[in-house]
Amino acid sequence: MSEGFTHLDADGAARMVDVGGKTKTRRLAVAACEVHLSPATMALLATAALPKGDALNTAKIAGIMAAKRTADLIPLCHPLPLAHADVRFDVDQAAAVVRVEAEASTVAETGVEMEALTAAMVAALTIYDMCKAVQKDIVVSQAKLLFKSGGKSGTFVSPDWPAGRPYPAS
């Protein structure tokens, strides 16, 4: 039953993978998602005029905090010593979309993809929370890993990585 699944034991029960024998390497991951708003809500967000305050600064802090707590939220994730975590936003007022991008890095035995994804998603959920008083039909979508480097599997670049954009320094 567990054949091919690293997080299942021989009986099919969940288990945490033993990474103790792996070599520590520098690992970096970039993840993204989108928050779709109405034009009216976007105008409030862009001018920091939402009733709850400045959504983007709050979301940035929430995303960074979430990256540091990923192992507490995702049951089989290893706690990692993060070297860096950041959250950035591309506010597209014309499309009424906030593109959230999160980056995390470490020197460890396992990757930081989940930390980057968690940071992006929690930042997006924080934007949702900050905007829900003025809009009920907000959509959070397109959560994905854009880039990862380090470790045995090497570098992954999503087809959605922007053309011409340099890869992060690993």
Swiss-Prot record:
Disulfide bonds: none annotated. It is an enzyme of class 4 (lyase). The keyword Isomerase does not apply. It catalyses: (8S)-3',8-cyclo-7,8-dihydroguanosine 5'-triphosphate = cyclic pyranopterin phosphate + diphosphate. Pathway: Cofactor biosynthesis; molybdopterin biosynthesis. One of its GO terms (molecular function) is cyclic pyranopterin monophosphate synthase activity. Keywords: Lyase, Molybdenum cofactor biosynthesis. InterPro entries: MoaC, MoaC_bact/euk, MoaC_sf, MoCo_biosynth_MoaA/MoaC, Mopterin_CF_biosynth-C_dom. Substrate binds at L76, C77, H78, M114, E115. Belongs to the MoaC family. Catalyzes the conversion of (8S)-3',8-cyclo-7,8-dihydroguanosine 5'-triphosphate to cyclic pyranopterin monophosphate (cPMP). This is Cyclic pyranopterin monophosphate synthase. The lineage of its organism: Bacteria, Pseudomonadati, Thermodesulfobacteriota, Desulfovibrionia, Desulfovibrionales.
